[in-house]
Amino acid sequence: MVEPAIGRNHIRAGRHHGRARIVFARTKNHAYLSHDAYCSRYPPIGRENADRLRIRTVVDRRTGRGAERWHRSPRQANGRFSNQRYSSTSPNSSPACPLIYFISIKAKRIACVVSAVIFVATSCVSPLTGFAFWETNLAYEGESIYNYLQVKNLSDRTILSTNVLFGVQSVTMKDKGLTGMYYDTALAAPALADNANSALILGMGTGTYARQLKQYYPKMNITGVEIDQKITDLAGEYFDEPADIPVTTYDGRAWLAASHDKYDVIMVDAYQDITIPFQMSSTEFFTMVREHLNPGGVMVVNMNMISDGQGSINEALSDTIASVFGNGNTLTADVPNTTNRELFAKKPGSGSEENSMQQASKALNLRETTYERTGSEDLEWYMEEVASRFRKVNEPDSASTILTDDKAPVEVLGMHAIDQIIADEAGPYRQILKDEGFGGLLRAVQ
């Protein structure tokens, strides 16, 4: 951009401020902010020992595009500034460019002032009222190094959410029954396994799955791993996490790498909201999980998004897991009225047909095994309903959809799934808006 010629009559404001003289000027097509500063290359630091640095920010008033130019004049031994200048230009780099642009064009000053007042007011009030200021039943609201955290105390349950507006990360039921969430479907894992004596939970949260396992399998030895220490603290304070369950604050994959223990059930629930960490989605990770299962053991993975079709995130995860556990050993089950899908993968055990995944997942066998191990008729009949939702996952025909440590684009695949979910949810409203206008849309959302 060509720098405009500035005359004395173009100067709008100028003053000395500390060690810098600040000037704002405006021409027909350009505006600029200029100030002299002083920079020292060596001690002692001070204006008398420093070079002069003239900084000029120029903005084209017609386009809003700007650039910043520096002129450095070295100080000579006699104290005067050299006429030799060292200059450099950085286009569109200065944070002052938008400010200069809006001041120079005098655009919508009232709107700018109102917006600034609202911004300042909400910035001051939000730390006092909390992010979810509309909630009236919050027991806790805060942040950890990993998450926004919200504990809500309802009449029948206490829930933990890691999102301001939606979603439930963990829940504890005050009547100690089933939760109505994906944890209930995941209770099929101990019934699918050859034995149900031990369990590892990667992504312990506040211990929802651990509490359910303890309720229905009281003799089971359970170990938890949770990366967020603050969530573990909240589990003890608000969610009655069983005190006899050891919980380690660590990354799930790193914990597996350091452990030699084996388990009958491993729950992978380390996916935050609707995001999936790539290091816990690859063949290398699932191979590590498989090695920590006893023969006949079952891994259950909570997938937060129901996304089908070629190239989807669920296809990639399912194919990756099936490639590790072998053909016929992987099942999925969608969770009703949610966007969750549970995936079960079994490590071959004794080799007998009756212990295979195909046999164990049949409704009658799943019911009988559940009742024999838990004595709960409610859970027994619920498992029959779960069995009706099982879908077999075959090994992939090619390696194109298999995720590895070298190639796991789960962020991109996840965003595609989110876009599809939003499109599906917004579809009916888009049609109402088209047919009935804004009035019809307002009536529809009331």
UniProtKB/Swiss-Prot annotation:
Skewed-composition ranges (Polar residues): 75-94
Keyword Transferase: yes
Stored CDD domains: AdoMet_MTases
Region (Disordered): 64-94
Annotated Gene3D superfamilies: Vaccinia Virus protein VP39 (3.40.50.150)
Residue numbers spanned by region Unknown: 1-117
Catalytic residues (UniProt): D269 (proton acceptor)
SUPFAM superfamilies to which the protein is assigned, alphabetical: S-adenosyl-L-methionine-dependent methyltransferases
Catalysis: reaction(s): S-adenosyl 3-(methylsulfanyl)propylamine + putrescine = S-methyl-5'-thioadenosine + spermidine + H(+)
EC number: 2.5.1.16
Record-level GO BP terms: spermidine biosynthetic process
Signal peptide (UniProt feature, chain positions): none
GO molecular function, one term: spermidine synthase activity
UniProt domain PABS: residue ranges: 116-351
Entry annotated with the keyword Transferase: yes
The protein's annotated pathway: Amine and polyamine biosynthesis; spermidine biosynthesis; spermidine from putrescine: step 1/1
Region described as Spermidine synthase: spans on this chain: 118-353
Binding site for S-methyl-5'-thioadenosine: N147, E226, D251, G252
Keywords attached to this entry: Cytoplasm, Polyamine biosynthesis, Spermidine biosynthesis, Transferase
NCBIfam families: MFS_SpdSyn
Family: Belongs to the spermidine/spermine synthase family.
Role summary: Catalyzes the irreversible transfer of a propylamine group from the amino donor S-adenosylmethioninamine (decarboxy-AdoMet) to putrescine (1,4-diaminobutane) to yield spermidine.
Protein name: Probable polyamine aminopropyl transferase
Species in which this protein is naturally found: Bifidobacterium longum (strain NCC 2705)
Lineage, top ranks: Bacteria, Bacillati, Actinomycetota, Actinomycetes, Bifidobacteriales
